[in-house]
Regions:
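Positively charged n-region of N-terminal signal peptides that target proteins for export
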Residues: 1-6
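Short, non-transmembrane alpha-helical segments in secretory-pathway proteins
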Residues: 39-81, 129-171
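Exposed beta-strand-loop-beta-strand "reactive/processing" segments of non-cytosolic proteins
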Residues: 61-111, 157-209, 268, 401
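Boundary at the C-terminal end of the N-terminal hydrophobic targeting segment
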Residues: 22-26
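Bacterial N-terminal signal peptides
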Residues: 8-19
Length: 669
């Protein structure tokens, strides 16, 4: 096991682009002993180990089997909501097993200590596992064709060259359908360059069966001179021109955040639970707001359910790069440790998260989750009275729950932000490094510049960053005062009038969605708001409590629907989808997006068009944005934030933030 952990750490550090802090912060100690406190708690290290042992002592797995997943099989939602402290906690694990080229699923009853179900899944591929990743890389770098390709470019195989297996995507012309393949580009890492992607070896790519280690093909195409080593990629990455005086967040005493049990979080009127998940990263559950002593439901569960990052370069060594990172690698599996004072305030609460590995054990990522409160520097509300020459107001404070997966060259800061006003923000900050390719063009006056930049931008001399998209799909099981909810659309319509001297104004038309499906854009109105509403309860004014879904980043995929990458990622074609709650519909692109040839996710979930009015429904939100690359992304991408807001409407009787005292002394007027 110790040897495996060392191998895992080496894999993680390499995939995270040689970030030494990742290695240093990876726990090598025995997994923590954790007691289960709630039915939605993540599997403990002991439970993961027990599940693997039960599978291996049954016919479901053997000593050679690898596990693409060993995760909590959640109880039915109705059972979770009916559970009370002190009641028994049923525990089941769901496992994905890979052995001798075959995939199967299993359900393990941990309470009864037995395997209760095994299902073969022919043609399906689990996410890329580290043992396969390492086998593929080593096989390619030992291949004579690889060595010869380097020599053609004046390079020698050795420690200054490294290669990183990527998920292969799906292109029909690939002759390796059914095999567990990865595609492998290579880079140079001499002169202690930081992530080394600054010097890609263009035209060289391996295709390897990661399961068998067979090198199926070596693409040795065009030869492009390596770009010069750019400044700013070394360990001395930042050299400020002038020192910046420290700006810090201070918290009186122990602050207002309370964390208990297994990541139960309480802050002001908010309560929720968080759990680690190898695929989703972090899942937020049982979100409630205490309204004058009454805990009210807002969300049963929220998490990232898939990503889609297609690059816009037709070159064969780039066209396959249409990554679906959650299902192909796992946001939790590649979560990075957080640094106090950089990733989170020094006053934050830092927590370690434990994940299952591929052989039935666990590893712990230290400081993988942080929870903190912060002043925004903005007023929560204010008003200036001209007659009294007096300002009244309160400063705004918010709670942030944060984790940061590092997916190859990109780091994604994923936040769930809660305010005293009852709003929830979903925020993602993209940073890290643009993926780049070498080019002969030094600047835009170079003879080849126009042709070379047809699918990207020159961001430094001899370096192009291809254009690409980012799509994050959130699964939002929102509960507005319970589970019987309806999705509404409030459209703003211009309305002519004939009195009062005006010609027109706008009015609101409300539409009910009656069936599952994508929520298409309404081009006839002056805008719209989606609203999840409970038609069976009312506020003091007899209005039905609702949650508005305010989307701010709404790019949708414009790829051809018959384009093979798009065929696997149908969720990206619409900003919102709505489906009836089903316990097995958890992932936007289906359970097995790795090497998939069709979409088994949202389009399939809603194909039967079930009725959704006054039902327990799930809203799926696609946070999409196009990345037109630019020199300002270089040498490192400044964090680019994207967000959507879940805002209460007709939910409270008044502004709920009026009841909280921020505890800040304001100067006398």
């Amino acid at each position: 096991m110790k040897k495996f952990i060392r191998t895992l750490i080496a894999f993680m550090s390499l995939f995270c682009l040689f970030d030494k802090t990742v290695v240093a912060q990876e726990s090598k100690d025995k997994p923590p002993v954790i007691a289960v406190a709630h039915p939605l708690d993540a599997l403990t290290p002991a439970e993961i180990k027990t599940a693997a042992e039960l599978l291996r002592t049954s016919s479901a797995a053997d000593k050679q089997s690898l596990f693409g997943a060993i995760t909590l099989l959640e109880p039915l939602k109705s059972d979770v909501l009916a559970w009370k402290p002190g009641m028994p906690i049923p525990r089941q694990a769901f496992a994905i097993i890979r052995n001798q080229g075959q995939t199967s699923e299993a359900v393990v009853d941990l309470t009864a200590g037995k395997v209760v179900q095994v299902t073969k899944k022919p043609g399906q591929h689990p996410m890329i596992m580290d043992r396969f990743w390492i086998k593929a890389r080593d096989a390619f770098m030992a291949d004579k064709r690889y060595v010869a390709a380097l020599e053609k470019r004046g390079l020698k195989a050795g420690k200054t060259i490294f290669c990183t297996p990527n998920s292969a995507g799906y292109l029909p012309e690939d002759a390796y359908q059914g095999r567990h393949i990865v595609k492998i580009p290579c880079f140079t890492s001499e002169n202690k360059l930081h992530p080394s992607i600054a010097r890609p070896i263009e035209g060289l790519m391996g295709i390897v069966d990661a399961e068998t280690g067979e090198v199926l093909a070596v693409h040795d195409r065009e030869i492009v001179a390596l770009p010069p080593a750019p400044e700013g990629y070394g360990d001395d990455l930042t050299k400020p021109d002038s020192p910046l005086k420290a700006v810090t967040i201070a918290v009186a005493g122990k602050g207002n955040v309370k964390i208990s049990e297994n990541y139960k979080i309480d802050w002001l009127n908010w309560s929720m639970r968080a759990r680690a998940d190898k695929r989703a990263g972090v899942i937020i559950s049982l979100v409630k707001f205490n309204d004058n002593g009454k805990p009210r439901d807002m969300a049963y569960q929220m998490n990232v359910a898939e990503m889609f990052v297609p690059y816009m370069d037709p070159n064969p060594t780039w066209a396959y790069r249409t990554f679906m990172d959650a299902g192909e690698f796992g946001l939790g599996y590649l979560m990075s440790s957080l640094q106090a004072g950089v990733d989170c305030p020094t006053t934050a609460n830092f927590m370690d998260l434990t994940f299952p590995n591929d052989v039935g054990g666990t590893y712990t990522r230290n400081k993988a989750l942080c929870v903190f409160e912060r002043p925004t520097g903005d007023p929560a509300w204010r008003h200036y009275s001209a007659s009294r020459k007096h300002v009244t107001g309160q400063p705004q404070t918010e709670l942030v729950v944060r984790h940061t997966p590092t997916l190859g060259n990109y780091d994604y800061v994923i936040d769930y932000v809660f305010s005293p006003q009852g709003t929830i923000k979903l925020r993602i900050g993209s940073t890290g490094f643009d993926a780049v390719k070498s080019t002969a063009a030094k600047d835009m006056e170079s003879p080849t510049a126009e042709a070379d930049t047809a699918f990207g931008s020159l961001i430094a001399p001899y370096l192009i960053a291809p254009n690409h998209d980012h799509y994050f799909s959130f699964r939002l099981d929102l509960d507005v005062d319970g589970q019987a909810n309806t999705l509404l659309q409030d459209s703003f319509l211009p309305t002519p009038i004939s009195n009062g001297g005006r010609k027109s104004l706008w009015t609101v038309k409300t539409q009910r969605f009656l069936k599952e499906g994508p929520i298409t854009t309404d081009h006839t109105s002056g805008g719209r708001l989606l609203r999840l509403s409970n038609g069976k309860t009312t506020n003091k004014l007899k209005q039905h409590p609702s949650l508005w879904l305010n989307a701010h980043h709404d790019a949708q995929s414009i790829l051809d629907l018959a384009d093979p990458p798009q065929m696997r990622a149908g969720f990206a074609t619409n900003q919102f989808w709505v489906s009836k709650l089903k316990p097995d519909e958890l992932w936007s692109a289906g359970l097995y997006p790795n090497l998939s040839t069709k979409d088994e996710g949202l389009p399939q979930f809603v194909a039967d068009g079930e009725a959704i009015a006054d039902e327990d429904i799930v809203v799926w939100y696609t946070m999409g944005f196009r990345h037109l690359t630019r020199p300002e992304d270089f040498p490192i991408l400044p964090t680019f934030w994207h967000e959507m807001t879940i805002r209460p409407a007709f939910f409270f009787d008044r502004d709920p933030s009026m009841t909280f005292n921020p505890g800040i002394d304001r100067p006398k007027q």
